[in-house]
Swiss-Prot record:
InterPro entries: Poneritoxin. Pfam families: Ponericin (PF07442). It is found in: Secreted. Expressed by the venom gland. Keywords: Antibiotic, Antimicrobial, Fungicide, Secreted. The keyword Metal-binding does not apply. This is M-poneritoxin-Ng3d. Belongs to the ponericin-G family. Its main location: secreted. The keyword ATP-binding does not apply. It comes from Neoponera goeldii. One of its GO terms (cellular component) is extracellular region. Has activity against some Gram-positive bacteria and S.cerevisiae. Has a non-hemolytic activity.
Length: 29
């Protein structure tokens, strides 16, 4: 289920830290 996957991804990002999220945002812009 996609929602479950998004929840898992969200938890993973929290554990890995905001650095990965910032990198993803930078790559998207």
């Amino acid at each position: 289920d996609f929602k479950d996957w998004m929840k898992t991804a969200g938890e993973w990002l929290k554990k890995k830290g905001p650095g990965i999220l910032k990198a993803a945002m930078a790559a998207a812009t």
